[in-house]
């Protein structure tokens, strides 16, 4: 049999843009890449599902196909379509420059890559809406997922589903991605979901973006889990705070398209009262950064916010990138936190699949 090879690229993403908590996301030109080779002459029997993994990039990840997020996700898609294992001789090399647990959508990129991988392995020919359904069964916040899958500047929401469909979309994640410990399956076999996801779990819209606006990310050198970051949020909000964000999100989605960009309007419309103030205690220096980094003191700055659940800071700017980055890094340094910075453009193509010749 001939050797098959293909490559899947998925951009990083930044969610919760300004007032757009759980709504707005952008794809960024920092790519998770997986290179898949299927060569029947290679012995892959050492893996329970015949997929050998290799990895280079940020952090450490599991190499067993039933524990790695990318291959777990692919196995879920395949299982829902009657496919148990990868083809014998499957090798998957993961190259991941996206920092783990920093608010740049590393898990969303992995999930999107896994869904695309399952689609290719099974030759399922799923369209983007159906691919999104599979993604949202695992990552139930569409802002990162839609941005990673589609690229660009995206708004999204979850549709209201029937009670039956809602039950399926809210099952414990261990039923979707079975939990394994020391090679042993922990999730009860009869609980593992093999039913295809409901149709149209989420909806998205693609906004325009002024390409003069660049994305400067300042990335602190510590991880912050989304679960921990969400745990500090209130269960109920005050109406004035909700209205505050609604007013700004209505302006921001248009302001980011206008040319020339109105820096002051974008800056004011990127303010938030729904999540950032509650996360100050988890990210030393965040409050100072938001107070000190303004268009008045940094010409070229359009807006600033927490990227996703943090701790990364997202600065939208047209100029003055080096000074902005250096001063944000210095604020964190005073808190004993080292940072890296990356200047990125939007990734407009989203996730892609390319076959070798």
From Swiss-Prot:
This is Homoserine kinase. Its EC number is 2.7.1.39. It comes from Candida albicans (strain SC5314 / ATCC MYA-2876) (Yeast). Belongs to the GHMP kinase family. Homoserine kinase subfamily. NCBIfam families: thrB. GO terms for molecular function: ATP binding; homoserine kinase activity. HAMAP family: Homoser_kinase (MF_00384). Commits homoserine to the threonine biosynthesis pathway by catalyzing its O-phosphorylation. Pathway: Amino-acid biosynthesis; L-threonine biosynthesis; L-threonine from L-aspartate: step 4/5. It catalyses: L-homoserine + ATP = O-phospho-L-homoserine + ADP + H(+). Disruption phenotype: Threonine auxotrophy. Leads to accumulation of toxic levels of homoserine. Sensitive to 5-fluorocytosine and sulfometuron methyl (a compound that increases flux through the threonine biosynthetic pathway). Decreases survival in a mouse model of infection. Homodimer. InterPro entries: GHMP_kinase_C_sf, GHMP_kinase_N_dom, GHMP_knse_ATP-bd_CS, Homoserine_kinase, Ribosomal_Su5_D2-typ_SF, Ribsml_uS5_D2-typ_fold_subgr. It comes from the Eukaryota. Keywords: Amino-acid biosynthesis, ATP-binding, Kinase, Nucleotide-binding, Threonine biosynthesis, Transferase. PROSITE patterns: GHMP_KINASES_ATP. GO terms for biological process: homoserine metabolic process; threonine biosynthetic process.
């Amino acid at each position: 049999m001939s050797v098959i090879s293909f490559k899947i690229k998925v951009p990083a993403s930044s969610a919760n843009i300004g007032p757009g908590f759980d709504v707005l996301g952008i794809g960024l030109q920092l790519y998770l890449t997986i290179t898949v080779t299927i060569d029947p002459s290679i012995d892959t029997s050492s893996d329970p599902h015949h997929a050998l993994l290799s990895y280079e990039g940020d952090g450490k990840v599991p190499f067993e196909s039933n524990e790695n997020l990318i291959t777990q996700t692919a196995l879920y898609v395949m299982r829902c379509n009657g496919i148990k294992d990868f083809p014998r001789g499957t090798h998957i090399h993961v190259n991941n420059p996206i920092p783990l647990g920093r608010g740049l959508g590393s898990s969303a990129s992995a999930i999107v890559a896994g869904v695309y991988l399952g689609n290719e392995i099974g030759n399922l020919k799923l369209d983007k809406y159906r691919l999104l359904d599979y993604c949202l069964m695992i990552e139930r916040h569409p802002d990162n997922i839609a941005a990673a899958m589609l690229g660009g500047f995206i708004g999204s929401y979850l549709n209201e589903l029937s009670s039956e469909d809602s039950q399926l979309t809210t099952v414990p994640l261990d039923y979707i991605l079975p939990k394994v410990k020391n090679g042993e399956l922990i999730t009860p076999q009869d609980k593992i979901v093999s039913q295809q996801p409901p149709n149209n779990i989420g909806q998205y819209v693609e906004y325009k973006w002024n390409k003069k606006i660049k994305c400067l990310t300042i990335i602190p050198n510590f991880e912050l889990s989304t679960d921990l970051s969400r745990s500090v949020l209130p269960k109920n909000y005050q109406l004035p705070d909700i209205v505050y964000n609604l007013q700004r999100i209505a302006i921001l989605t248009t302001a980011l398209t206008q040319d020339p960009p109105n820096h002051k309007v974008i800056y004011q419309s990127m303010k938030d009262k729904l999540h950032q103030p509650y996360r100050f205690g988890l990210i030393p220096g965040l409050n100072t950064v938001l107070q000190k980094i303004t268009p008045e003191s940094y010409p070229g700055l359009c807006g600033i916010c927490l990227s996703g659940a943090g701790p990364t800071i997202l600065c939208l700017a047209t100029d003055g990138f080096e000074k902005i980055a250096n001063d944000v890094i210095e604020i964190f340094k005073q808190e004993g936190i080292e940072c890296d910075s990356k200047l990125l453009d939007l990734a407009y193509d989203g996730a892609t699949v390319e076959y070798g010749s």
